[in-house]
Amino acid sequence: MVRRLTPVVLAAALAASVAGLAGGPAYASAGSRPVLSVGGEVTTAASYTAEQLAALPQATATVTVGGRQVTDTGVLLETLVTSAGPAYPASLLNTKNELLRVTVTVRGAGHRQVTFAVGELDAGFGNHPALLALTQNGHRIAHGPELVVPGDRAPVRFVPRVSRLTVGIATTPATDTNPAAGSPVEIIDGHHHVTLSAALLARLPAETLPVSFLGPSGTQTHTEVGPSLLTVLAAARIRPTLSTWVAAVGLDNYVATVTPAEQLVGGRPLQLSLNEDGVALAQPRLVTDGDVHGGRYVSGVVDIYVGTGPAR
């Protein structure tokens, strides 16, 4: 069965991405050699030939390229992650929404690399899918699978000749569950550790963001006020790339991952809210505007872990 995604008009720059497929090795004509490997923190690592990928459930996305529409068909990125099965450590078994800790890093031609939070891709949360395209307008893409992200504003996260998917899982240390109200937020990026006080966060440029999402009791609508996640990272002197992931940790040790690229390229605001519906929050809240479900909203944020490539 072919699943059809919502048609999206992309910037004309997509033409450059399509043109970039020229050159490099083509598919083996018989399709007998693997063209894609899936590994990392998975229960079942796998390699796929072109024919094996084509035999998986297919989805289509219609986009506009240079004023003309093209239709890409292939495998949803999340399908391949689900098939491999994230290998959660014992400490995360039976953890609420453990899928929201999972990332997948896509690598292609010229060592080009892009990381996604699986929560962004999942239809129950972010509902912003990515597609490993195998054909375009019914014709096989000659030089191997191409990653396309139909909902993005521009083809910045598109990856030609994809050869490797690496799954990662954000495993963060337990937080202090009894901090005082207005405790600072700790930003941890490897050996780079920055403390952002409540006063400093309050001085950062703030945005007002009306949001709506599904919660346990139905649709919730709020007005959030606070700095964007990009502004918070800049305050910590962190410059994100397309491979950067961020894991927000709440007072209850609830964790959800996002990527700055969701806002930079996908146009979906990410915010560290300090005020909700006119009431100051005791601790910041991660807000993921555009998600259909509020699972990636993290209340009482005390720690923010930042990494590049597969989460760990």
Regions found by a protein language model. Give the residues of each.
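Secretory targeting and sorting signals
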Residues: 1-28
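N-terminal intrinsically disordered, low-complexity segments enriched in P/E/S/T
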Residues: 2-3, 27-312
